[in-house]
Amino acid sequence: MTDRQNEVLAVLGELADAWNAGDAAAYASHFTEDADYVTFFGMNMPGHATIESAHRALFEGPLRGSKLVSGGGEPKVRFVRPDVAIVVSGGGSSLSGGEPVPGRESTLTYVLVEESGGWRVASFQNTRVSDPAAGVPMGGERRTLG
């Protein structure tokens, strides 16, 4: 890895640290003011303030005590311009600090921009890993509505 790739990956490490501490303000501080955050179920949370308030509610509610878990090998870091990086990595979460929950594995895509001497996330997408042929999330059971 180059120094610049390591700078970008350090931001992802800081995001994980903030998540694991349940600190919504620290988590959101790594996003640009106009960032887009697309959840695993396709909802877009536009803007820094929305990302912070949504994560505060999550960290105080259903994701209290959850921890991020890396997975899927080394993250891929690609610079599309010197000040724009795309990172694709794997990951998941454990609830209440336990073992990773089957069916929560994701492919994570980040677009980071360098501004004011540091890297910030301009766009993020969390895509759950699934088996489209079976309609079942990998490691999980078939889920239906109703």
Label every PLM stretch briefly.
Residues 142-146:
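Extended, polar beta-sheet/loop recognition surfaces of beta-rich domains
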Residues 5-6, 11, 24-83, 89-90, ...:
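A solvent-exposed, acidic/Ser-Thr-rich amphipathic alpha-helical stretch
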Residues 93-97, 112:
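Beta-strand elements of well-folded, non-transmembrane domains
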Residues 105-136:
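Short beta-strand edge/turn micro-motifs at domain boundaries
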Residues 1-4, 134-136:
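A detector for short, charged/polar N-terminal pre-domain segments
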Residues 15, 22-23:
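Short helix-adjacent coil turns
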